[in-house]
Amino acid sequence: MDFKIQWFPGHMTKAKRMMEQQLKLVDVVVEMLDARIPRSSSNPMLIQMLGDKPKVVALNKIDMADPEKTEKWLQTFKNSGLPVCKVDCSTGKGVKQMVAAIQQVARPVTDKWLRKGVRNRSIRVMIVGVPNVGKSTLINRLVGKNKVVAADRPGVTRGQQWVTIAKGLELLDTPGVLWPKFEDPEVGFCLAVTGAIKEDVYDRETAVELLLERLMHIYPEDLRVKYAIDFSEAEPVREVMSKIAVARGCLKVGGVLDIDKVIQLVLRDFRTGRLGRFTLDEPSENN
């Protein structure tokens, strides 16, 4: 796969330094992963920063991921000894279970407080993850009000902010942070098509071609049904794009393929879940 991205805006460098400082103040870290790409959305730079800090893994956007593969990923994390839960921050599904997991992993800390006579102290939690994974939406769900800016595009949450909620949790929202170079082009591809990377730093046409090729082999029936087209799995991806263009009216004058409209259509349908429930990262024993 020839898909290279290098994206590390200046505010991310600053955010990384801030998180390293804030880590000293928190009791638990929640690493939020995109359930469609659990491996690719796990930031190796963050893993190195966190060290042995108590951590909970939250698989978000489960409503857009392949349910069967999500269960396999949950088992993979459990087998590695990591507390993990699946959540849908947009609806609140699984959020209570995540809070319970946070309280459980923080138990040694809170027990230590009690032995020292410290009471009524909130568990301080840092939420980390790549851009657009749903961190601010989670905090808004926990708080019950839109106290944190959230939007469906990468790079929205620029400052770090603490939010205290009534359940004895004090949360720190952090800007999404990527790492400066993706050694595995598969990781860059997955982050790009799910919307974690701004579209002006990679070739969208290549991304959509690779995405359609992947879906043609893994989820062919979803493609056929969604766009009312027929194709063989060995068919060239450009021909499939042309069929989508005809089916959805993405044509210029004279019946010429409007590639920009097809790209926009496929990315939108994939990112919003309209195309189907897909998981691009395959769970395996070696993850």
Residue ranges of each PLM-predicted region?
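Short, glycine/charged-enriched secondary-structure capping and boundary segments
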Residues: P44-I47, E71-L74, V99-A101, N140-L142, ...
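Canonical P-loop GTPase G-domain recognition
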Residues: V56, I62-G129, K147, R248-L251
